[in-house]
């Protein structure tokens, strides 16, 4: 089992970009013991663009996609419950001996950069705790009893997440949606960066 590695659940949004950058920073801080790419689990149903469009971004973030065995009936459904995706990703992490899963979801409110939805944040945390317990119950099979799911940005507003993205020097401009001015994700985050006075947002 790898105690140092972490798996990041990725949908291609700002939260997952920040989480991958943060994981990379932690890896580099470990020196020779922390070499190697960060494993990620693609949330294909919610991926904000076709996966190949993220190749340059993923290369910049030094991540690798964990081998997944997609269910053709579920894997690309955008109505698949987030809890089911998280459960599948956490089981995948355990099967690969990875004991730490990062679910970079946040409770920001679209159009109100400084606000967050407290009730939604609490649901995200509860979901992570329940998935952790469910997967731990299956530890006799995967031998990863210490598995845990963290939600480091659950109570972040859009503004806080954007500021962290800047602090970490994340390459969010390489995301396909950032180069598509018609996308909802671009509209949302362009507005956030403008609100915090980031003149280099474009």
Which ranges hold each PLM region?
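ATP-dependent adenylation/nucleotidyltransferase module used to activate substrates
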Residues: 1-171
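Cys/His-clustered metal-coordination modules, chiefly Zn-binding fingers
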Residues: 150-202
């Amino acid at each position: 089992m790898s105690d140092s590695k972490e798996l990041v659940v990725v949908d291609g949004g700002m939260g997952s970009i920040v989480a991958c950058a943060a994981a990379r920073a932690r890896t580099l801080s470990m020196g020779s013991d922390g070499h190697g790419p960060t494993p990620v689990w693609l949330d294909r149903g919610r991926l904000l663009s076709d996966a190949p469009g993220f190749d340059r971004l993923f290369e910049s973030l030094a991540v690798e996609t964990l081998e997944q065995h997609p269910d053709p009936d579920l894997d690309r459904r955008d109505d698949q419950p987030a809890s089911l995706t998280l459960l599948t990703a956490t089981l995948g992490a355990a099967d690969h001996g990875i004991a730490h899963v990062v679910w970079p979801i946040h409770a920001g409110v679209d159009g109100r950069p400084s606000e967050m939805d407290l009730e939604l944040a609490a649901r995200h945390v509860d979901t992570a705790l329940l998935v952790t317990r469910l997967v731990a119950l299956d530890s006799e099979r995967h031998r990863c009893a210490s598995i845990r799911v963290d939600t480091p940005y659950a109570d972040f507003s859009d503004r806080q997440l954007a500021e962290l993205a800047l602090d970490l020097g994340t390459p969010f401009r390489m995301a396909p949606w950032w180069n598509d001015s018609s996308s909802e994700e671009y509209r949302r985050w362009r507005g956030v960066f403008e609100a915090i006075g980031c003149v280099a947002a474009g």
